[in-house]
A protein has these predicted regions:
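Charged, amphipathic alpha-helical segments and their flanking helix caps
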Residues: 1-31, 44-143
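A short, hydrophobic beta-strand-centered structural micro-motif
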Residues: 35-45
């Protein structure tokens, strides 16, 4: 069986890929983007939340890094904002991540400027908090 957290990451990657608004989507990349707009997905870890008898509850942090390239500062900023909006609209649907999670929250967004890039590049990191539950002691079984 596959761990629920791996299923959640696969669901995020699949949803963003299927939405087809980014030229590059990669999970846990080892280098910067090469196609734009780009979305990179990072594992921010998880922490236990208050559970109940027979259930482990978790809050998982997922960092979505988006990057756009080109245009004026205003155009790049608008494209960056639209990329973030598209991520939220794609992932915040019911059932949450196909029923793998009980809730998804949008955390902080941190805009980024690639100051040494050969072309104008703006980006963001958006934290998502994903709540999910597993059978106590069995991280492969959704509860």
């Amino acid at each position: 069986m596959t761990a629920v957290r791996e299923q959640i990451f696969a669901a995020i990657e699949a949803a963003l890929t299927d939405a087809d608004f980014a030229a590059e989507i990669e999970r846990m990349p080892s280098a910067g983007p090469t196609k734009f707009p780009a979305l990179h997905i990072y594992d921010g870890g998880d922490i236990p939340a208050v559970g109940e008898a027979g259930t482990d509850r978790w809050e998982m942090s997922v960092e979505i890094e988006g990057t756009v390239e080109g245009g004026t500062g205003a155009e790049a900023h608008a494209a960056m904002s639209q990329l973030d909006t598209s991520v939220i609209e794609t992932l915040f649907v019911e059932p949450v991540l196909g029923g793998l999670a009980t809730e998804i929250e949008a955390g902080a967004i941190r805009p980024l400027v690639a100051e040494r890039a050969s072309k104008r590049r703006l980006g963001f990191t958006r934290t998502l908090i994903i709540h999910y539950a597993t059978r106590r002691g069995s991280p492969q079984v959704i509860d």
